[in-house]
Structure formats: C-alpha cells, structure tokens
Design a protein with these regions (language model features):
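Conserved H-loop
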Residues: 181-188
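Conserved beta-strand-loop-alpha-helix hinge in the C-terminal portion
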Residues: 160, 198-219
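A short, flexible loop at the N-terminus of ABC-type nucleotide-binding domains that lies
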Residues: 1-27, 33-35
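ABC-family P-loop ATPase nucleotide-binding domains
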Residues: 10, 67, 72-156, 164
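Conserved catalytic loops of ABC-family nucleotide-binding domains
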Residues: 165-180
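ABC ATPase nucleotide-binding domain signature region
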Residues: 32-93
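Conserved catalytic network of the ASCE P-loop NTPase/AAA+ motor domain
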Residues: 63-64, 137-138, 167-171
C-alpha cells in the first residue's frame, strides 16, 4: 500500500509560490492500478517523485508499505560515464540481484548492440529512455511508477517486447501512471484520479475522471 496522509507540497518559482498538493489524503492499494490525469503545468513529476521517495512533502506523511519503483525515465541512479552494461550490474548489486541476469535482460530488451558497451553519455535521449525502462522492468517491484507512458521509440520490436512485458506486470502488480492525455491511461488504469488546482480527486472509473478533466480543461 502507498498512502498520502494530509500531504502538502509547494515550491518557490522565483516570482510566486506554486502549490502541487494542499493537505491531501489518498491511498493506492496493491492490485488496483491508478491512472492520474494532470494538465501540463501541474508538476505531476513532483507527485511521482514523492511517491518514489525522491522528494519529501512540506507537511503530512507518506507511508510506503511495499516495494515501489523509481519513476520511469529517472536517470539519477545511472552514471553517464559508464556503459549500460556497467550501470545494469551496479543497479543489480544495489538491489541484491544477480548482475548477470539484469545485464542480460536489459541487453535483450534494449537491443542497442555495440552501444550497450559504450558510455551512456554517447546515447541519444531515446536510447537513454529505453535503457531506463528496461532497467525498471528488470527489477521486481510491487508498484511501478510511470510518468507519461512508455518511452517513444520508432523500433517496432522494442515497442512490442516492452509493451508485452509491461502488460504482464500490470496483470500481477500495481501501476501508477500520470499523464495529461486520457488515452495514455486507458490500457493501464483500473481506477483514476484528477490532479488539478492542488487537489487530488479520485474516481471509480477512468471515464468519470475523463469527464471532469475534459470539462475543467475547457474552463
């Protein structure tokens, strides 16, 4: 279970204070994947980072009663000076996992051939995103955190393998995905919420959340 209890979060932009959450309570139960609709500018990445423990709330408490992933696309745990192979082995050891398995899994999924043995500083943004996505799926978590869906890739084979693996995770774990596009959430979410004007409003279905989100977007 992941629980936000009376959590508030804001930061200073240089000209004004921007509020992300204002004294909000919600929880994510294991087995119930949550899709969060959030317009651009609501700083949804901060919300995901708080779930992962990368950022602290200003007030309130966040309880993590299970194993929660780093956010998809988070590169803070990898070193651009090292190769993907070296990074995969390093992260595996941090999680007390078999480095050879994690290395092989990431190499198979990303499939970037000789680049796998080159420093990640030489990678394109797309290659970095694919590697971090592979690394997240290589590790076993109870809750997977995704910001704006799967990484965009023109590689049809990668999209197929990654999509199948993510669906397998959805079937047996919990996904929390945040996006400004309702269609991004359709294949992942069993429940939904809207983050807007520092309020977190939960709904039983994505369609209910979409109706409120679309209506407020027109105001």
């Amino acid at each position: 279970m992941l629980e936000f209890s009376n959590v508030s979060k804001s930061f200073w932009t240089g000209t004004q204070r921007k509020v992300i959450l204002g004294d909000e309570y919600f929880r994510v139960e294991l087995g119930t994947s949550l899709g969060i609709l959030a317009p651009n500018g609501t700083d949804k990445t901060t919300l995901i980072n708080m779930m992962a423990g990368l950022e602290k709330p200003d007030e309130g408490r966040i309880f993590r009663g299970c194993n929660i992933s780093f956010p998809l696309g988070f590169i803070g745990g990898t070193s651009p000076r090292h190769t993907a192979k070296e990074n995969a082995c390093y992260i595996a050891r941090l999680y007390s996992l078999d480095p050879h398995y994690i290395e092989a899994f990431c190499g198979w999924l990303v499939d970037i051939e000789e680049y796998f043995d080159m420093p990640m500083a030489t990678y394109s943004s797309g290659m970095n995103a694919r590697f971090n996505f592979a690394l997240m799926l290589a590790l076993e978590f109870d809750i997977y955190l995704i910001d704006e869906g799967m990484p965009s890739s023109p590689d049809v084979e990668f999209n197929k393998k990654a999509g199948d693996l993510l669906q397998e995770r959805i079937d047996r774990t919990t996904i929390v995905i945040v996006s400004h596009q309702p269609q991004t959430l359709e294949q992942f979410a069993t429940q939904a919420a809207v983050l807007r004007d520092w309020q977190f409003i939960q709904f039983n279905t994505l369609e209910e959340a979409r109706q409120v989100y679309d209506f407020e977007s027109q105001i």
